[in-house]
């Protein structure tokens, strides 16, 4: 399992749009918003490839400007 903390930088994304995103082999938890910066997520995936796919899906959400990985832990 690989886990990551992610910052979603956005202009006007509803947190519910991020919460309801369906990821194939990964699970995510919206931890909350950071004033002026975006939304922090925790993502757990089966493999590095699955994590990459999940990050790609987040980047496709309308209004998302950047998807930044803050930390990665491989368990």
Residue ranges and their predicted role:
Residues 1-75:
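A compositional/biophysical signature of low hydrophobicity enriched in polar/charged and small residues
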């Amino acid at each position: 399992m690989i886990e990551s903390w992610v910052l979603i930088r956005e202009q006007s994304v509803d947190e519910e749009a991020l919460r309801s995103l369906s990821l194939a082999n990964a699970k995510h938890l919206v931890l909350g918003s950071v004033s002026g910066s975006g939304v922090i997520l925790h993502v757990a995936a089966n493999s590095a490839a699955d994590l990459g796919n999940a990050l790609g899906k987040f980047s496709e959400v309308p209004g998302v400007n950047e998807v930044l990985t803050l930390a990665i832990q491989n368990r």
